[in-house]
């Protein structure tokens, strides 16, 4: 069996689960998330514990089993605690600012890069070199953080660019003169 898929998910107090066919809705103190699960994986609720079962043991089902359980666990975790990603801008003149729901990034290009922030995510710029993204959906938070990082990902020679806080950028040595 899948090692992650067979672990049951504990449902904390204050979290409601509603299943309508393949559509699962998780409602908690921070909000509500809805996701369509695979029809091959069966979900069973027993008190405050949810477990997932698969029909057979082929590789595709094993992978789907663990993924379904992990996605559901992230939904429960998100409506209770939420998720947060922190980015830092490293480089001379690299800075970020928030105007309304628009994130403006000055990253060494000729024009600033403007990005609209989604309604369901909270984007903060505590100082002009740090960006905090928080929300209840782990996937949405990670996608927006990756999108911002992709505008100018860290380069290996000077380490300039947008990186996650605590991310290690492997450095390379430059060319040596004759």
UniProtKB/Swiss-Prot annotation:
GO terms for biological process: cytoplasmic translation. The keyword rRNA-binding applies. It holds the Pfam family Ribosomal_L6. One of its GO terms (cellular component) is cytosolic large ribosomal subunit. The keyword RNA-binding applies. InterPro entries: Ribosomal_uL6-like, Ribosomal_uL6-like_a/b-dom_sf, Ribosomal_uL6_a/b-dom, Ribosomal_uL6_bac-type, Ribosomal_uL6_CS. One of its GO terms (molecular function) is rRNA binding. Part of the 50S ribosomal subunit. Belongs to the universal ribosomal protein uL6 family. This protein binds to the 23S rRNA, and is important in its secondary structure. It is located near the subunit interface in the base of the L7/L12 stalk, and near the tRNA binding site of the peptidyltransferase center. This is Large ribosomal subunit protein uL6. The lineage of its organism: Bacteria, Bacillati, Bacillota, Bacilli, Lactobacillales. The gene is rplF.
């Amino acid at each position: 069996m899948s090692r992650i898929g067979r672990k049951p998910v504990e449902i904390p107090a204050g979290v409601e689960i509603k299943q309508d066919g393949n559509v699962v809705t998780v409602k908690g103190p921070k909000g509500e998330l809805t996701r369509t699960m695979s029809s091959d994986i069966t979900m069973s609720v027993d008190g405050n514990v949810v477990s997932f079962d698969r029909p057979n043991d082929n590789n595709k089902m094993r992978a789907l089993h663990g993924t379904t359980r992990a996605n559901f666990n992230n939904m429960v975790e998100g409506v209770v605690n939420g998720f947060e990603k922190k980015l830092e801008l490293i480089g001379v003149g690299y800075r970020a600012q928030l105007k309304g729901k628009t994130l403006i990034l000055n990253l060494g290009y000729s024009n600033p890069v403007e990005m609209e922030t989604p309604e369901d995510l909270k984007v903060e710029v505590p100082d002009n070199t740090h960006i905090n993204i928080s929300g209840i959906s782990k996937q949405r938070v990670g996608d927006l953080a990756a999108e911002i990082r992709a505008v100018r990902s860290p380069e290996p020679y000077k380490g300039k660019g947008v990186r996650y806080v605590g991310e290690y950028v492997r450095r390379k040595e430059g060319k040596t003169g004759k």
